[in-house]
């Protein structure tokens, strides 16, 4: 009787124990990451051939205390390696674990190798050769604290490598994990099984192999016992022959079918090729189909199971796309699969909640380093005929109402960028902006008192509802998180995609970038102010300070300004402004772009202008500015500098975003200036719900 150890993925240990017992294993003991068991030589081969869940099966050879590298060397030599190595067998050492004495796994492997080789040379026997790539024997040493556990790896390559998969699709799951998912799904062999996002087909192939009694080890060409001195080839051939007979009979007797689909034609080709290599290709129908096209292949029955490992962040980099995918899958299940079961394996329980289905059972497991969950659902027959439930229904209804109102208005105004929703409902605390055929959802950061998990779930619901109501492609939705900005944080770069899209605003064409920065390059709430500047600028010299991307300069130029001067401290935004001007045909020396500290430039310049637009930050302590700036504290000093630049009869349009800003009218009067507040006049319909979003004034000489 041999003492053995079978390793497996975390979370599958009990399932593996049951499987090993069904094969005849004795004295099974579950530990984290595997099962200790006992069995004779036939059971060794049976477990290697038939275990669908084990990652590796090890034959423990001994253990030793390791307080020095010499202890490791002598402990390895305590094993009689001549009883392990067949003549001429090559080997490799896999060493894992460290302690205070063995601090490098390569060094540990080297000491083990030396000990094994020296045990042969000391007996005047031919020393075995090392073959790291394709060894006959794999010696496994695991150092746990002060104890080294020495084993013979009987598998060679991991048991998940069944031999049927050539090239996997994106982010595949291992075959033994796939087998566990099938076992836990509730699916019964003889009933239909469908995977609508099958990738390389692993779930379906593993299920078909189970259903047809095909051993998972039948297609493997190499094993870790080939160079084992105690290998019994006769027993192994018996085990293999029995597996071949059972596979042929199982395939001939099986009458049900499997269905797989995926949106990628190349992946489907690989899946079909994998199934053929596994010997069950004739049982699986593969087709290229998106989840949006998913229907029941057996609408008149019988009932079956839908199983899948949908993408959950490791396979797609767009969260809105994942949310839309899961929402769509949930609706398809309700629409077409009443009476069926559904089982999904995912690394994101939040995404599974987008299905809007209640799970009956769930299991936990690891997919590599990822904590994952498998949830099983039953779709009642009435659900298959019912209208899918609406995600975030109150929010969806409000967004639908706003869309009807603003879409028509925006078309009449000649604008392609506008706000559709601005935290209208307190529990759905986001802003939703349209930029042509793109949507930007800005999440206002939740207070620390709000549970982070609940806030994330609410956001997922919002994104799903937004995509559903607006009918946009998921890749046309951009998600941002907005917090209170300090200084120039709103200008910090968030991405390097560099994707610009062209949008229309009245008679202007402008470039916006929806992904690389917190803001997009166009402040939508200043839309009317920009139009006013265009109407006021004919024949005038126009100065645009803290100009950002120069959209106000574009409107002034299109309005017939004699010249435009666009100033900002950022070279990036000035280059953006230059692109905006050029897009509208505003080129030439009369359209200047200046990179400068605005406040310092104002104090030093003696230039004169007829129309000045200034939209300073609420507060700034930029290293590139000479001192700090606070718009409430410093606006009169700012007006004093601006007055020097203002020609007789000229106008300053002064705007800021400080809530509760108070204009110092007495201070203005002392400068010989007066102010007319136009804050409400510059708010368009889409911002009427937020009357404090900006302050705006026209300032002229008395």
UniProtKB/Swiss-Prot annotation:
Molecular-function annotations in GO: 23S rRNA (guanine(2445)-N(2))-methyltransferase activity; RNA binding; rRNA (guanine-N7-)-methyltransferase activity
Catalytic activity: guanosine(2445) in 23S rRNA + S-adenosyl-L-methionine = N(2)-methylguanosine(2445) in 23S rRNA + S-adenosyl-L-homocysteine + H(+); guanosine(2069) in 23S rRNA + S-adenosyl-L-methionine = N(2)-methylguanosine(2069) in 23S rRNA + S-adenosyl-L-homocysteine + H(+)
Gene3D superfamilies with a match to the protein in the record: 3.30.2130.30, RNA methyltransferase domain (HRMD) like (3.30.750.80), Vaccinia Virus protein VP39 (3.40.50.150)
Keywords: Cytoplasm, Methyltransferase, RNA-binding, rRNA processing, S-adenosyl-L-methionine, Transferase
SMART domains: THUMP
Record domain THUMP: where: 43-154
Cited InterPro entries: 23SrRNA_methyltr_KL (IPR017244), DNA_methylase_N6_adenine_CS (IPR002052), RlmKL-like_Mtase (IPR000241), RlmKL-like_Mtase_CS (IPR053943), RlmL_1st (IPR054170), SAM-dep_methyl-trfase (IPR019614), SAM-dependent_MTases_sf (IPR029063), THUMP_dom (IPR004114)
EC number from the UniProt entry: 2.1.1.173, 2.1.1.264
Predominant cellular place of this UniProt entry's protein: cytoplasm
Pfam families, A to Z: Methyltrans_SAM, RlmL_1st, THUMP, UPF0020
Subcellular location: Cytoplasm
Top-level taxon in the UniProt lineage: Bacteria
GO cellular component, one term: cytoplasm
Protein role: Specifically methylates the guanine in position 2445 (m2G2445) and the guanine in position 2069 (m7G2069) of 23S rRNA.
Similarity comment: Belongs to the methyltransferase superfamily. RlmKL family.
Name this protein carries in UniProt: Ribosomal RNA large subunit methyltransferase K/L
Lineage, top ranks: Bacteria, Pseudomonadati, Pseudomonadota, Gammaproteobacteria, Enterobacterales
